[in-house]
Amino acid sequence: MRKPIIAGNWKMNLTLKDAVAFAEEVKGTVPASSKVDAAVCAPSVFLAHLTEATAGTDLKIGAQNMYDQESGAFTGEISPVMLKELGVTYVVLGHSERREYFGETDAFINSKTKKAFEHGLVPIVCVGETLEEREGGKFESVIREQTTNSLKGLTVDQVKNLVVAYEPVWAIGTGKSATEQDAQDSCKFVRDVIAAEFGTEAAEAVRIQYGGSVKPDNIKEYMAQPDIDGALVGGASLETGSFLKLLEAI
């Protein structure tokens, strides 16, 4: 039985004061980690404050990105060593916004994923198609390529322990959301691709999130699907009330 995982992706939002207040309010209220993994993936400048505020609780902290080197002349970048030292648990890699706005490739995401594992971080690897790709009948080829290339060279054990977030780009921050059946079919396809590459055991163990305008009023329908193990949530994770409602729905 795969444990559900709900991760908030705050993107470039909130202030430090708001972020710490969120953590202080939520950390004692989240369900036990034996039932569901709960995390918020925050801007890097908040991470030290948040890991300190949530230490010893069931609310885990994630980063939204990292570089694929431990150190060096990479101005503005953050290394996995730095994240691990701060007590970060998860790191989102390959989000569609990183792919679109910063030109991140599957190969770069793959390199980051391997480096995250080297340093004891849990990667949340994002894959997803645009509306144009879906309507053009390219969904399967795009998702197969992204999934295969982003996970290339990982061990079976690593695949079992990572998280894949399927995020249809056309449903992110648009208010549109895939139907629960569409989301299920898409997440099952991701699992099938992983099975073909890494075997059934890995595919049955890996947790797959759906991300795309998930809210408290629709999360139950998504979570009822057999191949959806959680959600990567944007806007609905910015307020304590809605974030806790997401967790209560599990």
Curated annotation (Swiss-Prot):
Its main location: cytoplasm. CDD domains: TIM (cd00311). It comes from Exiguobacterium sibiricum (strain DSM 17290 / CCUG 55495 / CIP 109462 / JCM 13490 / 255-15). Pathway: Carbohydrate biosynthesis; gluconeogenesis; Carbohydrate degradation; glycolysis; D-glyceraldehyde 3-phosphate from glycerone phosphate: step 1/1. The active site is at 95 (electrophile), 167 (proton acceptor). One of its GO terms (molecular function) is triose-phosphate isomerase activity. It is an enzyme of class 5 (isomerase). PANTHER family: TRIOSEPHOSPHATE ISOMERASE. The keyword Cell wall biogenesis/degradation does not apply. InterPro entries: Aldolase_TIM, TIM_sf, TrioseP_Isoase_bac/euk, Triosephosphate_isomerase, Triosephosphate_isomerase_AS. This is Triosephosphate isomerase. It is found in: Cytoplasm. The keyword Disulfide bond does not apply. It comes from the Bacteria. GO terms for biological process: gluconeogenesis; glyceraldehyde-3-phosphate biosynthetic process; glycerol catabolic process; glycolytic process. SUPFAM superfamilies: Triosephosphate isomerase (TIM) (SSF51351). Pfam families: TIM (PF00121). Keywords: Cytoplasm, Gluconeogenesis, Glycolysis, Isomerase.
